[in-house]
């Protein structure tokens, strides 16, 4: 069973990975026609439902751990365009970075990793005082955004995850995984059930008790006068004086009860030489049944001949 569970987890990994990729939001930098995967911050409204576009600015200071200096510019508040702040991870909490950017007049924040790591993380913050859109991108994506940021209106966009595609992939993944698990379970349990069913429905060939009783019997007196030997090959006990033995056509003898039980319950062959006694036993039985008919026919034929001679 552990093998089945391990196989299921191994098969499920690619589906879960693809689902995570489809669930990612994207950052689009229009100036170089590039898009980057990102993870929204963990609070409702972390990325506007219909997406948001605006001008991208590199934060000053870059770590965003103190109020950003852009607000000190004389023309900062006159620009009504949506403003994005690009901030590097580290030195302080995500919540401090977002609050500093928000208080400096930014409507969206892109935080990028400070180490070269492809795994994105979810920024966990207290949503009570935060209203800006916020996403997290990799170090590579952040360095590219930093290089090409121009502060132009509409140059950068945040697109929310495509929920429809995510649910489609989830449904396909679920049913595919269910199908694979079903196949593995069938492959695991079917042979056992087949073996049990076959064992229950396979009938052992046995002799009828009436045929067994037609086999000759004798009383054991001395092993020197009999070919039966001294020990029963079925129960492995020595013969005792006066015990009843049954003799098979192959000239092997056994205790009466032992061989009768063997032939009526377990098989039709001699336990010693495997000689099948069905043919000889049945043929002798048929011969006995046909003998009276033959004698009657012969007597009738003789009577008819004698009548004609008269």
From Swiss-Prot:
Record flagged with keyword Protein transport: yes
Pfam families found in the cross-reference section: PA (PF02225), zf-RING_2 (PF13639)
Alphabetized GO MF terms: transcription cis-regulatory region binding; zinc ion binding
Residue spans of biased composition, Basic and acidic residues class: 284-293
GO biological process annotation, one example: intracellular protein transport
Location of the protein in the cell: Prevacuolar compartment membrane; Protein storage vacuole membrane; Golgi apparatus membrane
SUPFAM superfamilies, alphabetized: PA domain (SSF52025), RING/U-box (SSF57850)
This protein's GO CC annotations: endoplasmic reticulum; Golgi membrane; protein storage vacuole membrane
Annotated stretches, region: Disordered: 284-310
PANTHER family: RING ZINC FINGER DOMAIN SUPERFAMILY PROTEIN-RELATED, RING-TYPE DOMAIN-CONTAINING PROTEIN
Protein name: Receptor homology region, transmembrane domain- and RING domain-containing protein 1
Source species of the chain: Arabidopsis thaliana (Mouse-ear cress)
């Amino acid at each position: 069973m552990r093998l089945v569970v391990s196989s299921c987890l191994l098969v499920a990994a690619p589906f879960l990975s693809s689902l995570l990729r489809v669930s990612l939001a994207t950052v689009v930098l229009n100036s170089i026609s590039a898009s980057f995967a990102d993870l929204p911050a963990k609070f409702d409204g972390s990325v506007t439902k219909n997406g948001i576009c605006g001008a991208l600015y590199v934060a000053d200071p870059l770590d965003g751990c103190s109020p950003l200096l852009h607000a000190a510019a004389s023309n900062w508040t006159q620009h009504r365009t949506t403003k994005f702040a690009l901030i590097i991870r580290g030195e302080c909490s995500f919540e401090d970075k977002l609050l500093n950017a928000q208080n400096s007049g930014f409507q969206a924040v892109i935080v990028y990793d400070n180490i070269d790591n492809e795994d994105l993380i979810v920024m966990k913050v207290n949503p009570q005082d935060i209203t800006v859109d916020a996403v997290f991108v990799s170090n590579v994506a952040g360095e590219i955004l930093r290089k090409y940021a121009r502060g132009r209106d509409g140059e950068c966009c945040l697109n929310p995850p495509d929920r429809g595609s995510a649910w489609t992939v989830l449904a396909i993944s679920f049913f595919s995984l269910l199908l694979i698990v079903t196949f593995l379970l069938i492959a695991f349990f079917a042979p056992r059930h087949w073996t049990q069913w076959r064992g229950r429905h396979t009938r052992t060939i046995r002799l009828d008790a009436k045929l067994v009783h037609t086999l000759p019997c004798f009383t054991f007196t001395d092993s020197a006068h009999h070919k039966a030997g001294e020990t029963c090959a079925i129960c492995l006990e020595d013969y005792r004086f006066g015990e009843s033995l049954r003799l098979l056509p192959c000239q092997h003898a056994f205790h009466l009860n032992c061989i009768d039980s063997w032939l009526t319950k377990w098989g039709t062959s001699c336990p010693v030489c495997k000689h099948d006694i069905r043919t000889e036993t049945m043929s002798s039985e048929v011969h006995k049944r046909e003998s009276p008919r033959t004698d009657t026919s012969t007597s009738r034929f003789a009577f008819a001949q004698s009548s004609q001679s008269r």
